[in-house]
Amino acid sequence: MLCQPAMLLDGLLLLATMAAAQHRGPEAGGHRQIHQVRRGQCSYTFVVPEPDICQLAPTAAPEALGGSNSLQRDLPASRLHLTDWRAQRAQRAQRVSQLEKILENNTQWLLKLEQSIKVNLRSHLVQAQQDTIQNQTTTMLALGANLMNQTKAQTHKLTAVEAQVLNQTLHMKTQMLENSLSTNKLERQMLMQSRELQRLQGRNRALETRLQALEAQHQAQLNSLQEKREQLHSLLGHQTGTLANLKHNLHALSSNSSSLQQQQQQLTEFVQRLVRIVAQDQHPVSLKTPKPVFQDCAEIKRSGVNTSGVYTIYETNMTKPLKVFCDMETDGGGWTLIQHREDGSVNFQRTWEEYKEGFGNVAREHWLGNEAVHRLTSRTAYLLRVELHDWEGRQTSIQYENFQLGSERQRYSLSVNDSSSSAGRKNSLAPQGTKFSTKDMDNDNCMCKCAQMLSGGWWFDACGLSNLNGIYYSVHQHLHKINGIRWHYFRGPSYSLHGTRMMLRPMGA
């Protein structure tokens, strides 16, 4: 930038020098002068022509000029030429002097111009520096503002990232706290389960000890039964001899039966004669009307009785009458009750013989007896009705067609057809052909002896889905009892019921 004024000054000097050279150009000869000008880092070279000095032409030799006469003729002409040359030379010297003055004036003017340019150049340089500083300041301010904006943006981003990291940290702390609480809860549960396991282990050890004691007791009972068996065997031998004696006496009695028949014949004839005598008498003889005989409650219902209560029936091939409770109101009446549970007043943990003959009060809790039910169901097809009541007031009933009970030799096996009920479609009663079991007669098709484990006598098929003769549990104690009064598809396998009834009626009655 500092070289531009110098270049301008040197250009002006060049123009002046070229103008002077042009003024002297026509007179210039073959010689030239070289002038070099340097201004700062720039240099300039000027080539100026130098005028030649004109020399007189050499005088020819006299021989060439044709003798002395020709020289004498040409001498005035040479002098004339020299005079012109001197006049031209003086004129040229004057012009050179003028050009030098012009050059000196131009040089002074150029020096003044240089000084003016330097002064102006300083002001321009100061202004240029100020403009440059202002531009740089503006640029730096713009850069600073841009940097500030970028810094603010980065600060906002960092603040957002910091907030996000803080939120994630709080979330992780919350999750760790929840995990810690969950871990503490699991530890407490594991501790409680460990304590419960220890308690169960202690109870299991107690049960094992009790089981060992029971096994020892059962072994002692088996030994006692073995001794009793041997005693019975010896007694059986004694009874065999006694039976032989009785047989001999029976033959003797049969021989005497003929005489008894004769006496009976005579007695019959005497009675007939007595009847004829009484018939011939004038006084009338009142005869009692024979009392009607019923084989079940349905026949009593057909006779016109409509009140539920205890009645007497006479079953086939039975020598003594049987008292039964007749329900004359439920579903048309005529039902003969064979089982009733309502308050736990009767213990149903009985032997085979007791279940065979029956026990309890027929007006309340009782079991009619397997033998009576067998004789009752052997003469015709019967309908079995089972009624169930729970502790919440709900009740249901199930009916089975073609119910029949086998003989004692058949272990009072169960025979029923399909059921219809409000307790679900599935059947909780034992399947066809299941035998009756008690605590002293195991017919349950299981090594576990269900009658002893679940209590009572019932048709157990590998312990099965029902037992209406189990232990009677009162309210608030009836839950989680597998040895209670249960019917699986009514209230589940461990709910002990409030009351039950089982009753029979001939089909079609």
From Swiss-Prot:
Record Pfam families: ANG-1, Fibrinogen_C
**Chain intervals for the UniProt region annotation (Disordered):** 416-436
Q: In which tissues is it expressed?
A: Widely expressed.
**Which InterPro entries does the record cross-reference, listed alphabetically?**
FIB_ANG-like, Fibrinogen-like_C, Fibrinogen_a/b/g_C_1, Fibrinogen_a/b/g_C_dom, Fibrinogen_CS
Q: Which protein, by its recorded name, is this?
A: Angiopoietin-4
Question: Coiled-coil ranges per the record?
Answer: 181-269
Q: What would be the name of the gene that encodes this protein?
A: Angpt4
Q: Alphabetically list the UniProt keywords.
A: Angiogenesis, Coiled coil, Disulfide bond, Glycoprotein, Secreted, Signal
* Quaternary context: Homodimer; disulfide-linked. Interacts with TEK/TIE2.
Q: Which GO terms describe its molecular function?
A: receptor tyrosine kinase binding; transmembrane receptor protein tyrosine kinase activator activity; vascular endothelial growth factor receptor binding
